[in-house]
Amino acid sequence: SAVTIARQEEYSKKMILELTKAVREHQLKYSNYSLPVVRTLEYIISHLSDELKIINLAKQVDMSVSNFCKLFKNETGLTVNEYITTQRCKKAAEFLSQTNFPVQEIGSYVGYDDNNYFVKVFKKVYNTTPTQYRKNQRKK
């Protein structure tokens, strides 16, 4: 019917606008970075639970480790490992505030198989333990 077609057209328009907005935001977010760095940032974010080695990240963008590390640091202001740690802790913080998953499970999900090490790294980034972070988030 005409109503159904109108609804589908409206839905399609909304989806196109949302997609266009997402693409624009993505372009703005990465506009200051070269293609190798953009690819690396995206790869890291989508593979946080994997073992992320600099040598493999450099290979993915066909660069030597030293050139890759220099480029990454120059463009992001962080070393590759600092960026990985920051992103892992950011993702862990999201899980801590939005889920009831056990801390150890969250640590493992973001790439830390050793729970003690995860707690140590998280505490270094957020100045609090994952458990305390969760409690503080729940109070808000």
For each feature predicted by the language model, list its residue ranges.
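An amphipathic alpha-helical interaction segment
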Residues: S1-E42, N67-C69
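DNA major-groove recognition helices of helix-turn-helix
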Residues: M15, E75, A92
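Generic C-terminal helix-cap and adjacent flexible tail
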Residues: K135-K140
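Hydrophobic alpha-helical connector segments
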Residues: S12, P102-V103
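Basic/polar phosphate-binding segments, predominantly the helix-turn-helix DNA-binding elements
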Residues: V23, I45, E51-Q87, T99-F101, ...
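Short alpha-helical "packing" element that flanks the helix-turn-helix/winged-helix DNA-binding module
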Residues: T40, I44, C89-A92
